[in-house]
A protein has these predicted regions:
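TOPRIM fold recognition
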Residues: 2-9, 15-154
Length: 154
């Protein structure tokens, strides 16, 4: 969504998210169906490079920095977890399911970085709404939500 050949392109997941982010920012967004749906990224980014793109921002959802600790809030699976009844507010208990999700998302982020490197495109990962530990603070998830939050601050 935006102008093919823009020097800077933002990659995010989901066409609706990209449409809204473009409408809010005027920037060019390349939308993938999901963070691990990278099969078409190489040819599309290569074509965009030929049209003038030089820099790619990875703007996937912030659950890429999901805190992988038990809080009894992840899903129905929490009730089946042996840690579910523990007092997770007083101790840090690792959550295997959240760690698996975070690892899967980060594989997609790394794949985008590899593609950019192979094509000779510079890139950077965008983050927002992080806590002091660098994990997602769980207030603002997508780049579209972030842009809306910025507008409400003004």
């Amino acid at each position: 969504v935006g102008k093919p050949g823009d020097k800077t392109v933002f990659v995010t997941e989901g066409p609706l998210k990209g449409d809204l982010a473009h409408a809010l920012s005027g920037r060019t967004f390349l939308c993938v169906p999901g963070v691990n749906q990278s099969v078409n990224l190489m040819p599309v980014l290569n074509e965009m490079k030929e049209l003038g793109t030089r820099f790619v921002y990875e703007a996937y959802d912030m659950d890429k920095l999901l805190r992988p600790v038990c809080q009894g809030d992840y899903s129905e699976n929490c009730k089946e977890c042996p840690c579910y009844r523990m007092d997770w507010k007083k101790q840090s208990i690792p959550c295997e399911k959240k760690q698996i999700k975070r690892d899967n998302i980060n594989r997609g982020c790394n794949k985008l970085a590899e593609i950019c490197k192979e094509l000779g495109l510079e890139g950077k990962t965008l983050t927002w709404d992080t806590d002091t530990d660098g994990n997602w603070a769980e207030n603002v998830k997508g780049v579209d939500d972030y842009l809306v939050a910025l507008q409400h601050r003004e």
